[in-house]
Amino acid sequence: MSLIDQAKEQMAKTVENTKENFSGIRTGRANPALLNGITVDYYGAPTPIKAVASIGVPEPRTLSVTPFDASQAGAVEKALRNSDLGISPNRDGNVIRLTMPELTEDRRKEYVKLAKGKAEDGKVAVRNIRRKTKETIDKAVKDGEMGEDEGDRLLKDLDKVTKSVTDEIDTLLETKQKEIMEV
């Protein structure tokens, strides 16, 4: 695997990580990914909520959480209540409903700022991958393992890959901003 392919692979992982980070940012709509970081005390063991309940979106602003084990509905509700989502769960038998409140303009701007920060974190990670790969190429040229022309060609390829990945992160950010600001 060439150095450029390795860098591409690492950068692709960074883009996926950035997408994951974006999925945790609230928009005006219900999104099951909002519950990804929540763990339930399931018979004494902290367990991800996805492993103990099914999560659905019956309406655009409502999430429904149905525990697989009905006796654990209380534990799931407690985990949702104690989470940092800022949403109060409503229990209806074994089904727990989370209704997303309308976001205020100030809140939307905060979330846009948060999204920009996560996008910048992704870009910094991409630049770090580029820097490490560039150092490896420069060292190989200096040690005579490859010619200067090949080193220059690899650096140009690396710059193209880096630009396309940062553009992809910018596109993801634009999409997320539109989602957040949509009323």
Curated annotation (Swiss-Prot):
Gene Ontology BP annotations: translational termination
Gene assigned in the entry: frr
SUPFAM superfamilies: Ribosome recycling factor, RRF
Gene Ontology CC entries for this record: cytoplasm
Gene3D superfamilies attached to this UniProt entry: 3.30.1360.40, Ribosome-recycling factor (1.10.132.20)
Organismal lineage: Bacteria, Bacillati, Actinomycetota, Actinomycetes, Bifidobacteriales
Entry keyword annotation includes Protein biosynthesis: yes
InterPro entries: Ribosome_recyc_fac, Ribosome_recyc_fac_dom, RRF_sf
Protein family per UniProt: Belongs to the RRF family.
Pfam families hit by this protein: RRF
Protein's UniProt name: Ribosome-recycling factor
Primary localisation category: cytoplasm
Top-rank lineage group of the source organism: Bacteria
Intracellular or extracellular location(s): Cytoplasm
Protein purpose: Responsible for the release of ribosomes from messenger RNA at the termination of protein biosynthesis. May increase the efficiency of translation by recycling ribosomes from one round of translation to another.
Keywords: Cytoplasm, Protein biosynthesis
Molecular function via GO: ribosomal large subunit binding
